Amino acid sequence: KRGFLDVIKHVGKAALSVVSHLINEGEH
């Protein structure tokens, strides 16, 4: 199950990066 949690963390970080990118694109 630890591997599963690692996947969740990885996906979460990726999602955060995408959201931040979209927000930055929207502001400019």
UniProtKB/Swiss-Prot annotation:
PTM-bearing positions, type Glutamic acid 1-amide: E25
Protein localization: Secreted
Annotated tissue distribution: Expressed by the skin glands.
Gene Ontology cellular component annotations, sorted alphabetically: extracellular region
GO BP: any one term: defense response
Positions annotated as propeptide: 27-28
Keywords attached to this entry: Amidation, Amphibian defense peptide, Antimicrobial, Cleavage on pair of basic residues, Secreted
Transcription is among the record's keywords: no
Main subcellular location of this protein, as a coarse class: secreted
Role of this protein: Has antimicrobial activity.
Family affiliation: Belongs to the frog skin active peptide (FSAP) family. Cruzioseptin subfamily.
Protein name (record): Cruzioseptin-4
